[in-house]
């Protein structure tokens, strides 16, 4: 895909696929027979839909960073380099009615919103706080329960108990639906997460937890804030477990599809663990400080494993033409640009009015 000197991490600007890494990428697909069967069962349309999702996620972040640099907004929380952890799992779920699953993203999993069916303009409107956005200008976290997206909660780590409750409702109603959420490595220090996973294990809830270890919590490396291995957690709580490559969208897809099948079969919760890397700052305001937390070799290591570039190279190896990929990129770029323009128009025409501030705060009897 096109690289943007003003917005992309420097490691991405001259990105080319490393032959050895691509051999590992292909081998990863076939390393587990169950996951291999899931991937090999995907149609070309499904594979290209995943590609569109990765592009949409990356270009969403590019648009936000463009807004920051041009003064439209003051900062943005981006998921550059972590797109596979979001897009693969979301595409493994049911994203339409009947029986739409429910996801509860962190702010860095914004791709879950548009891949579950929210128009991308709605996500941009949320950042701008417009009155016609999903929250009516009351929250900068995007979500829409009609699309199966529970908005993030500002208190880090408070979402897992909520998604566990949603999964409990599926179980009690006999609905063939699954809940899913992501947990950052830093968020694992929150007590509510442990309560949620324990409850899900005891009640055999149809829910998937993904520990998204991007190596850093705000400005604290995982080696400083956590001891032991997250791989031990599933056994601790008596739930199914697994690990996938956080920069490999197909491995993420397959692991999540199997976990969803496990839940739908009445076998209960799954805790998946994945390693990836935050290529920028906690938000756009601290990128320089964030890059001082790790040495240049670490950024090069993860930069060479760009999840969008790796998947694009894999698709070409599977016979998808460069022209076809470029056409898809042009379509998605136009979609994202149009969504950003719609949101900017809303900022001019549909900002929330002060006399509506108390509306929607309490439910009426």
Locate each region found by the language model.
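A generic structural signal for short, non-catalytic loop/turn and secondary-structure boundary residues
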Residues: 47-49, 96-98, 135, 265-267
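Glycine-rich ThDP/TPP pyrophosphate-binding loop and its adjacent helix/strand module
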Residues: 149-348
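Conserved acidic/glycine
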Residues: 1-85, 282, 288-365
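Short acidic/polar alpha-helix capping motifs at helix-coil junctions
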Residues: 26-31, 129-131, 196-198, 276-278
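Cofactor-binding active-site loop characterized by glycine-rich and histidine/acidic residues
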Residues: 65-203, 221-231, 236-238
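Short acidic, gly/pro-rich beta-turn/loop elements at beta-sheet edges
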Residues: 113-115, 219, 282, 353
């Amino acid at each position: 895909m096109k690289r943007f000197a003003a917005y992309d991490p420097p490691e991405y600007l001259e990105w080319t696929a490393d032959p050895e890494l691509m051999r590992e990428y292909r081998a990863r697909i076939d390393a587990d027979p169950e996951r291999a069967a899931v991937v090999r069962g995907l149609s070309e349309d499904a594979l290209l839909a995943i590609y569109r999702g990765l592009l949409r996620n990356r270009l969403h972040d590019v648009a936000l960073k463009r807004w920051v640099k041009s003064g439209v907004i003051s900062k943005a929380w981006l998921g550059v380099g972590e797109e596979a952890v979001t897009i693969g799992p979301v595409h493994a779920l049911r994203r339409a009615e009947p029986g739409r699953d429910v996801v509860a993203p962190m702010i860095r999993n914004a791709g879950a919103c548009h891949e579950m069916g929210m128009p991308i303009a709605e996500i941009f409107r949320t950042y701008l706080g417009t009155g016609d956005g999903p929250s009516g200008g009351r929250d900068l976290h995007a979500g829409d329960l009609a699309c199966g997206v529970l908005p993030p909660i500002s208190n880090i780590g408070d979402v897992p108990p909520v998604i566990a409750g949603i999964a409990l409702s599926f179980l009690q109603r006999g609905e063939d639906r699954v809940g899913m959420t992501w947990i950052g490595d830093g968020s694992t220090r929150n007590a509510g997460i442990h309560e949620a996973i324990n409850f899900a294990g005891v009640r055999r809830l149809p829910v998937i937890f993904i520990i998204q270890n991007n190596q850093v919590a705000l400005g604290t490396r995982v080696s400083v804030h956590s001891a032991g291995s997250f791989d031990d957690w599933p056994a601790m709580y008596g739930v199914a477990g697994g690990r996938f490559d956080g920069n490999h969208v197909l491995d993420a897809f397959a692991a999540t599809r199997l976990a969803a099948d496990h839940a739908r079969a009445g076998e209960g919760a799954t805790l998946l663990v994945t390693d990836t890397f935050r290529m920028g700052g906690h938000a756009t305001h601290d990128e320089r400080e964030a890059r001082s937390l790790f040495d240049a070799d670490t950024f090069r290591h993860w930069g060479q494993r760009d999840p969008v570039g790796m998947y694009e190279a894999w698709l070409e190896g599977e016979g998808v033409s460069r022209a076809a990929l470029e056409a898809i990129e042009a379509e998605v770029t136009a979609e994202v640009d149009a969504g950003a323009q719609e949101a900017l128009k809303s900022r001019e025409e549909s900002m929330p009015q002060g006399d509506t501030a108390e509306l929607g705060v309490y439910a009426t009897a």
